[in-house]
Curated annotation (Swiss-Prot):
Keywords tagged on the record: Riboflavin biosynthesis, Transferase
E.C. code: 2.5.1.78
Protein name from the UniProt record: 6,7-dimethyl-8-ribityllumazine synthase
Organism (species): Xylella fastidiosa (strain Temecula1 / ATCC 700964)
Disulfide links within the chain: none
Enzyme class: transferase
Binding, 5-amino-6-(D-ribitylamino)uracil: W22, A56, W57, E58, C80, V81, V82, N113
Length: 154
């Protein structure tokens, strides 16, 4: 029986972080965490690109263009959507996730979902370097592992 599992060795891969500017204090911390994770695991600074988009809604179209361009082994999507008084939050968070899933299924390029969908800004703070860690860093580690795994699969 064969067993396949990715590791955290980048093997010369390029990565791109697509991050929303909305809730910048949170998203800046997510980007910093992702960059540190990549560099700490051997990815050179010049093998990481960062693309800023206005909000989470715009992440899938940019991820799609980048995936089709074929210059990156994985796309790390980061953002922060906070529940408000209307259902807008649900539409943005759900359709952003669906869009990212569609991109990776259609292109074969992993799109890792680090878009926070939280009840309040305090929840986001806890996930952007607070008591719940840094989800940007965790998403970058998942990207490293997926790139490695996809290279190993028959």
């Amino acid at each position: 029986m064969s067993h396949y599992e990715g590791d955290l060795r980048p093997a010369g891969a390029r990565f791109v972080i697509v991050c929303s500017r909305w809730n910048a204090r949170i998203t800046d911390a997510l980007v910093a965490g992702a960059c540190h994770s990549l560099v700490d695991n051997g990815v050179p600074d010049d093998a990481v690109d960062v693309v800023r988009v206005p909000g989470a809604w715009e992440i899938p179209i940019v991820a799609n263009l980048l995936a089709q361009a074929g210059q990156h082994a994985a796309i790390i999507a980061l953002g922060c959507v906070v529940r408000g008084d209307t259902r807008h939050y649900e539409h943005v968070a759900d359709l952003c996730a669906e869009g990212m899933m569609s991109v990776q299924m259609q292109t074969g390029v992993p799109v890792l979902n680090g878009v926070l969908a939280v009840e309040c800004i305090k929840d986001a703070e806890m996930r952007a370097g607070g008591s719940h860690g840094n989800k940007g860093a965790e998403t970058a580690l998942a990207a490293l592992e997926m790139v490695s795994l996809l290279e190993k699969l028959p």
